[in-house]
Amino acid sequence: LEHSLSVTRLCDKISGNYEFLNRDLLISCAMLHDVGKVKELSEFPRNDYTDEGNFLGHIVMGYEMVMEKIKNIPDFPPIIANEMGHCILSHHGELEYGSPKKPAIAEAVALSMADNIDAKLETLRECFEAKDTNDWLGFNRWLESNIRRTSF
C-alpha cells in the first residue's frame, strides 16, 4: 500500500511537469497498478505466493480485476479501458521484468518510471537502515551496483 501511494505521489508530480500527460489516467493507474498483489500473495502472516499468483502474477491478475470492475460501469469509454489496461500490463516496463507489454503510451512510460524509481529508492533505504555506516555496503544484485550512503 505504501508503494502504491508513493508511486501515485510521484505520478502526480510528473503530471504537473508534463502537461501532455492525461493526469486522471496516470493517477488512476498509479493507484491500481499493483492491485493484483492482493490475490497474488496469501494473507498475513503467511505472505506467500498463492497458486494463482505463481501461475499468473500480479500484473495479469490486476489487469483482470480492473477490467472486470470496468465492465460494470455503464458507458465506460472503451479507449480509456484499453489505456488503463495497457498501463497496468506494462508497468514493469520491460518484458524481462515481467510485463506482458512494453509501455506504448506516455502515461504507461511515466507509470513504469515512477514504479521503478520508488522500488529502487526503497531498496536503497532498506540497505541504509540495515547498516548504519558511510562505508561501502557491498554489491546489491537488484541494483547491480556496489552502494554506499552519500557523505553529507
Regions found by a protein language model. Give the residues of each.
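Compositionally biased, low-complexity linear motifs
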Residues: R125-L143
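Divalent metal-dependent catalytic cores for phosphoryl transfer on phosphate-bearing substrates
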Residues: K13-K131
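All-alpha helical catalytic cores of prenyl diphosphate-utilizing isoprenoid enzymes
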Residues: L1-R9, V35
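Active-site cofactor/co-catalyst pockets and adjacent glycine-rich loops in catalytic enzymes
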Residues: I147
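N-terminal intrinsically disordered, cationic/polar leader segments
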Residues: M31, S112, L137-R141, T150-F152
